[in-house]
Each structure stands twice: as structure tokens, then as C-alpha cells.
Amino acid sequence: MNTLLLSINWNPNPELFNLFGISIRYYGLLWAVGIFFAYIIVHYQFRDKKIDEKKFDPLFFYCFFGILIGARLGHCLFYDPGQYLTSGKGFVEMLLPIKFLAGGGWKFTGYEGLASHGGTLGLMIALWLYCRKTKLHYMDVVDMIAVATPITACFIRLANLMNSEIIGNPTNVPWAFVFERVDMLPRHPGQLYEAIAYLILFFIMIYLYKNYSKKLHRGFFFGLCLAYIFTFRFFIEFVKQNQEAFEDNMMFNMGQWLSVPFIIIGFYFMFFYDRKKVAKK
């Protein structure tokens, strides 16, 4: 049987609509929806733990810029340092959302290339700075962020799906997607696999928070978030297309190697860190 008949042809217009010459894209909208849900969830936890809400206001400023800067630097340094570190123009393109044109001048492109591992590191550093300023315990804050992270990650992967990016390897499974903007081969919808996995983790987090948060030690939610997401990320990479050509000859690709430290850290915080104490309520 022709596997194309069993595949889902995928070629959505990434632009939702155009408003006064400004392109509103699914990618940005889904990112915004994910951040909105995280905002609601973390705000609820602040109120539940009776933390001064004045300390909540600057939190998402730190989170946004920590993730953005970390994700951008992570992509440039981990995946394509030759492009961004060998010329002045490349260095500027790493820092600013522009691209220099061959004939001169430049154009606004947004940040083309963001790495989740770098975003995670950037977020952790930003939260450390936030906690120094607000005098909140670092692990209490990262636990709250961890509860909300999976739903944001889910919407980010749906955004990748709408952009037909981070595609999977060719396959003949009946739920394969044909990403027509790339080629006509049926492929694993890796973005959808990740989105579903993160949605499941989100429901697990909410269940544990509502029913067991007073019994779980400080750092548990942070550890579970890291261990679950990056363990899944490690294994899903086997059915995803490598992002850069240099990864083709590696036993494990860059995403898998970068996931290993986060997995180890995650299990440490789940099973060994501060087990005799429960999180501040």
C-alpha cells in the first residue's frame, strides 16, 4: 500500500493574518498562549503560598529575557559557532534579530534559531538573579516555575509544528506527516510527540501539586520537570532529523549530549536533594 495514502499532508500557512502590514503568525501566537498559561499558574501558586504579590510582578520579566537570551546564545554557541563567532556581522546577528543582506543593508528576521537547553540555562540564571533581589528561596521559585513549564513547552512545540520545523525522520507509520514545505516524504511528527508528552507532564504536575505538594520535598517539582522533559528529549531525538550536518556522524546528536546533564540534575533533585524538608507553604 502506498504510504502516502496513510500520511497527513501538512502545509499550513504560518501567517494567521496580516494587520496593517504586520504579520501575525501562529508561531508567535502559540508562544504567547503558552506564556499566558504559565503566568496564570505561577500567579496562582504565589497566592496559594501567600507570597507578597509585589514580588510576582518582575518575575516574568526575568523569565522572558532569561529564556530568550539563553535560547539564542545556546543555539549559536552549541549548534553553529562558526557562523556567529568568526565575523563581526555574525556576532551582531547572534545578538540582534536581524540578517545582513549580501547586497548590503539588513532586514529584520526575528531570532532564527533558539535552543531549549540554552533557554533552560538562561532561565535558571535569571531566576537566581530574581531570587537575590526578592530574597525568596531559589528552590521554591524554580519549583513553581517547573509546575507551569510543561504547558508552555507544549505550546512551543505546537508552534514548531505550525512552522513545519524540527521535523522527524522519514517513516511509514500511518500517522506520519508530509511536511510539504520541506519535501514529500512521510515523516515522524516529532513536534507533536513532544507536545503530547509535555501535556501529559503538565497534568501530572497539576495532580501532584494539588494533592501532594505539602508532602513533597523542596526541589521535587524542579527535578521532575528536568528529568521528564530531557529524558523524553533524549529518546525522541532518535526519530528526529538532525539540526546541523556535523551531527550526522555522531553517536548521539548535540541535543542528546546536552540533555544528559539536565537528566542527572533532575534525578538528583527528585530523589536526593533536601528530602527531609518540604517546600515552604
Swiss-Prot record:
It is a multi-pass membrane protein. It holds the Pfam family LGT. It is found in: Cell inner membrane. InterPro entries: Lgt. This is Phosphatidylglycerol--prolipoprotein diacylglyceryl transferase. Signal peptide: none annotated. Catalyzes the transfer of the diacylglyceryl group from phosphatidylglycerol to the sulfhydryl group of the N-terminal cysteine of a prolipoprotein, the first step in the formation of mature lipoproteins. The chain crosses the membrane at residues 26-46, 59-79, 110-130, 136-156, 189-209, 219-239, 252-272. Keywords: Cell inner membrane, Cell membrane, Membrane, Transferase, Transmembrane, Transmembrane helix. Its main location: membrane. A 1,2-diacyl-sn-glycero-3-phospho-(1'-sn-glycerol) binds at residue 157. It is an enzyme of class 2 (transferase). HAMAP family: Lgt. Pathway: Protein modification; lipoprotein biosynthesis (diacylglyceryl transfer). One of its GO terms (biological process) is lipoprotein biosynthetic process.
